[in-house]
A protein has these predicted regions:
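Terminal amphipathic alpha-helical/low-complexity segments used for targeting or macromolecular assembly
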Residues: 1-39, 146-149, 153-164
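Left-handed beta-helix
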Residues: 38, 43-44, 49-50, 55-56, ...
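Conserved catalytic-core motifs of eukaryotic protein kinase domains, centered on the activation segment
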Residues: 85-86, 117, 152-153
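Regulatory activation segment
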Residues: 89-97
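Glycine-rich, phosphate-binding/catalytic loops in enzymes
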Residues: 92, 123, 141, 158-159
Length: 164
């Protein structure tokens, strides 16, 4: 992984740690600072791995508070990760309205990932794609609505991710 954590990512990580320690006011204050500086909405309740990368300082990124994002995932600018008109899935008897995104995923600029779907490890989401169905591990999803056009081999997936 060539990229390093940028300022918006650092602010989010501190906000998340404060949130987990039940220090809600400072956590929300940092969320607001990110919103003002980078026009992004990344709530501290979102379970985003500390090693996830926000491209271009998270400019215009909007993420649902129930979202899970795995390690080393790259989320480019203008991405929306959110709910889909009240649709949900059950996980441990709890309603989940937002996407679950695996590790080492690449989400291209302007992509929209909507609803209680699962994006598998090493998946690639094309720029501008509107994803409302699950994407398998190592799947490549593009288009509006997005379709999985290919499932990469292990070698292809690792090679593609290493170029980010």
């Amino acid at each position: 992984m060539k990229q390093k954590k940028n300022l918006s990512g650092r602010i989010f990580n501190i906000s998340r740690k404060l949130y987990l320690k039940k220090m809600l006011l400072p956590a929300k204050l940092l969320e607001s600072i990110n919103r003002i500086l980078f026009s992004c909405e990344i709530p501290p309740s979102a379970d985003i791995h500390p090693n996830a990368i926000f491209g271009h300082n998270a400019l215009g990124i909007v993420i649902n508070e129930q979202t899970f994002v795995g390690e080393n995932t790259v989320i480019m600018h203008q991405v929306t990760i959110g709910g889909n008109m009240g649709k949900y899935r059950l996980k441990d008897k709890q309603k989940i309205y937002a996407p679950t995104i695996g590790k080492n995923v690449m989400i291209g600029t302007g992509a929209k990932i909507l609803g209680p779907i699962i994006i598998g490890d090493y998946a690639q989401i094309g720029a501008g794609a509107v994803v409302h169905k699950d994407v398998p591990n190592k799947g490549v999803a593009v288009g509006i609505p997005a379709t999985t056009i290919k499932v990469l081999s292990d070698k292809e997936a690792i090679e593609a991710y290493s170029k980010i």
